[in-house]
UniProtKB/Swiss-Prot annotation:
It is found in: Cytoplasm. Belongs to the UreF family. Required for maturation of urease via the functional incorporation of the urease nickel metallocenter. InterPro entries: UreF, UreF_sf. UreD, UreF and UreG form a complex that acts as a GTP-hydrolysis-dependent molecular chaperone, activating the urease apoprotein by helping to assemble the nickel containing metallocenter of UreC. The UreE protein probably delivers the nickel. GO terms for cellular component: cytoplasm. Its main location: cytoplasm. This is Urease accessory protein UreF. The keyword Thylakoid does not apply. One of its GO terms (molecular function) is nickel cation binding. The lineage of its organism: Bacteria, Pseudomonadati, Pseudomonadota, Gammaproteobacteria, Pasteurellales. It comes from the Bacteria. Keywords: Chaperone, Cytoplasm, Nickel insertion.
Length: 227
């Protein structure tokens, strides 16, 4: 039961890291009329899951989890730098490492793991940024969480964020949002299966439409979100 509690704490939406402030380009899609219904929001989140997250944040989380298990700080720093290069839009890039730094600040107070301290020192020395998926993986492994369950929780947390933001932005009913989440159960499990041993040739696969909307977000006339 202790591991379940730790995992629930790690994905708790009330963690004071600011995740609710970011739409990662969804706000642009809505303002341009590309996402305007329950069906289009469901298509959007499933596309993000199966064509973006499993090759980017999820894949790097998986690799960082393994590097943490192997006590390989150099590999963690390398993965953090590679993930930085894959995040084209400034707002999304900055948002991710700000979330990561805040997450590390919370959990390092309770998890006495030397690599967490060394990674935090590397951030302060500008040797890495501390991107959210990397830190998430490190904290999860430090708490001896199961890798597959960690990936599922990460993807589910990301999906909930998209659906919550979409319900607010379109707008849609709360029940529409719940229906979308119910429909994600099988895709989430498939995403986890695909991410347990990522294909290195697909790391950082581009999602041009999302990257463009994330960059356009900076120029929107009105904005509810920081990205």
């Amino acid at each position: 039961m202790g591991q379940l509690g730790a995992l629930l704490h790690l994905v708790d939406p009330t963690l004071p890291i600011g995740g609710f402030n970011h739409s990662n380009g969804l706000e642009t899609f809505v303002q341009q009329g590309k996402v305007n219904s329950r069906a289009s929001l469901e298509e959007y989140v499933q596309t993000q899951l199966m064509q973006n997250w499993i090759y980017n944040d999820g894949a790097y989380l998986s690799l960082a989890f393994d590097a943490m298990a192997n006590h390989d700080l150099d590999r963690l720093l390398q993965l953090d730098q590679e993930l930085a290069a894959s995040k084209i839009a400034r707002e999304s890039r900055e948002g991710s490492y700000k979330l990561g730094v805040r997450l590390l600040k919370i959990f390092i107070r309770y998890e006495n793991h030397p690599l967490l301290s060394e990674f935090q020192q590397a951030i302060s020395e500008k040797r890495c940024q501390g991107y959210f998926p990397i830190v998430f993986a490190m904290v999860a492994q430090a708490m001896n969480l199961d890798k597959a369950e960690t990936l599922y929780a990460f993807y589910y947390n990301a999906a909930v964020g998209v659906v919550t933001n979409g319900v607010k932005l379109v707008p849609l009913s709360q029940m529409d949002g719940q229906d979308i989440l119910f429909a994600l159960r099988t895709p989430l499990a498939q995403a986890v299966e695909n991410s347990l041993n990522p294909d290195l040739d697909w790391l950082g696969a581009a999602t041009l439409a999302s990257d463009i909307r994330s960059m356009q977000h900076e120029q929107l006339y009105t904005r509810l979100y920081m990205s």
